[in-house]
Regions:
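Transmembrane alpha-helical segments and their short flanking loops
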Residues: 2-19, 61, 65, 259-268, ...
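Early transmembrane hairpin of solute transport permeases
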Residues: 17-159, 330
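Core transmembrane alpha-helical segments of multi-pass membrane transporters/permeases
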Residues: 23, 27-48, 136-144, 171-193, ...
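Alpha-helical membrane segments and immediately flanking helix-loop junctions
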Residues: 23, 83-97, 107-111, 264-334, ...
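Alpha-helical transmembrane segments in multi-pass membrane proteins
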Residues: 41, 83, 87, 91, ...
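Short juxtamembrane and helix-loop transition motifs at transmembrane-helix boundaries
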Residues: 60-73, 202-209, 267-273, 295-306, ...
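Membrane-interface helix-loop-helix junctions at boundaries between adjacent transmembrane segments
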Residues: 102, 119-220
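Generic multipass alpha-helical transmembrane bundles of integral membrane proteins
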Residues: 180-299
């Protein structure tokens, strides 16, 4: 075990640290995460539609059906405009990392994004790419725009006004050069894409990323994500915070597509969404530790019992850092196998049950800090998802049990030695 830990520490830690420190990757992750509250609000609109579908008939159904346009109205300005908000947040985050003041870089990123997505049909501007289909274009627009700003300011390629001019006016003129450069380049790219690629730039990006977009929503991809998430946690690094830099943009795009499909009465396609990760795969926290928490509460070892009692309330709401650091699970040889590999078995069960249609796929993106089963039901509007959550927790508890007993035995021996 020690040799394995040393090898992983040697090769895995440098990569994880670089991912944590890389500005662009972190800007994408933070920007996507900042967009999630908007998706949560928009996804609640689908709950009204789901309730109507569950009822089938009756006065409540008639009321919901008659007012569905009003009840789902907000969805058009939240889920259906996901790429707009993500573009702004990503650009804003990256500009802050470069110490660029004000909101001008983020607003310019929106200008670039709209130019790249501009498709005129019958004299009207299409909104086709403002949602999940334009998300990757938004990422490109945000990163590109801020880089242009950074280069311009670093090399002093901007209009510098006398110090007697008010700061607001100085900032306005300073932003002109990078704004003009970004606009010219965006117009050129958009027209080149339409002229030579015969498609809008967002579609060109989607075509190029098609293998990755399709491949991320598969069982092997999910298992890889979960494995590295748990492994990083085991070594004391915040697993989801690091791995989400890779998968967050895909997961939130899948969620938006599912919500849009369900609202339109079409089949829901995707399994791997932000909601799935936090509401089911990490229910009660990474490693599905609620069962372990209960075992620790009932432990004869005082140290484990006290940690279990302190951790139970946060654990019910998906926060298990007190348990991870208090036990500790980090670098604990007894916990390596159940904490890292147990969730992989649970992930396989979740994917297969949803893929086979035994449990409904995600149609909403509720917050993951609700008690076990609650967020899963809100995410799928399927009571079987609640059963699935408790089956997973029981299974993971069984998986933890023999390793917990070994850990408890060692802790009892330590406590008895101290008492002597």
């Amino acid at each position: 075990m020690e040799k394995i830990q040393n090898v992983l520490m040697k090769y895995l830690m440098p990569i994880a640290n670089k991912l944590e420190q890389q500005k662009h990757i972190q800007a994408i992750k933070d920007g996507i995460v900042a967009s999630i509250p908007i998706i949560i609000v928009g996804s609640f609109c689908t709950i009204f539609l789901g309730i109507a579908n569950l009822l089938g008939s009756g006065p409540v159904y008639d009321f919901l059906n008659a007012n569905m346009g009003v009840l789902t109205y907000a969805s058009a300005f939240t889920n259906d405009m996901l790429a707009v908000y993500a573009t702004y947040f990503i650009a804003k985050t990256l500009s802050e990392k470069y110490d660029l003041k004000g909101s001008q870089p983020a607003v310019t990123a929106l200008v670039v994004f709209f130019i790249l997505c501009a498709v005129v049909k019958d004299g009207q501007l299409s909104t086709s790419y403002l949602g999940s289909t334009g998300l990757f274009t938004g990422i490109v627009a945000a990163l590109f725009t801020v880089e242009i700003y950074h280069i311009c300011y670093e090399r002093k390629w901007y209009i510098k006004m006398p110090e007697s001019v008010p700061p607001m006016v100085q900032d306005m003129f300073a932003a002109l050069v990078p704004l003009v450069l970004n606009t010219i380049i965006a117009v050129a790219i958009a027209n080149l894409s339409l002229t030579f690629g015969k498609v809008a730039f967002p579609q060109l990006i989607m075509n190029a990323l098609a293998p990755a977009v399709t491949g991320m929503d598969t069982l092997p991809a999910l298992l890889i994500v979960m494995f590295f998430t748990q492994l990083l946690w085991f070594f004391g690094l915040h697993g989801p915070s690091i791995t989400s830099a890779v998968w967050a943009s895909f997961a939130i795009a899948y969620a938006a597509e599912n919500i849009a499909a369900y609202t339109a009465g079409q089949p829901v396609q995707h399994i791997f969404t932000f909601g799935l990760f936090y509401c089911i795969l990490c229910v009660s926290g990474s490693g599905l530790t609620l069962g372990l928490n209960i075992l620790m509460m009932r432990s004869k070892a005082k140290s484990l019992s006290s940690v279990g009692k302190v951790s139970i309330i946060p654990g019910l709401f998906g926060i298990n850092e007190p348990l991870i650091f208090g036990t500790p699970i980090i670098l604990n040889p007894f916990m390596f196998i159940p904490f890292v590999f147990g969730p992989l078995i649970c992930t396989t069960i979740v994917y297969l049950t949803m893929n086979l249609g035994l449990v409904g796929k995600p149609i909403a993106n509720p917050p993951g800090f609700l008690p076990p089963g609650v967020s899963a039901f809100l995410m799928t509007l399927d009571w079987k998802s609640v059963v699935l959550v408790f089956v997973l927790l029981i299974l993971q508890t069984v998986f933890y049990y023999p390793f917990f007993k070994m850990m408890e035995k060692e802790e009892l021996q330590k406590e008895q030695a101290l008492e002597k």
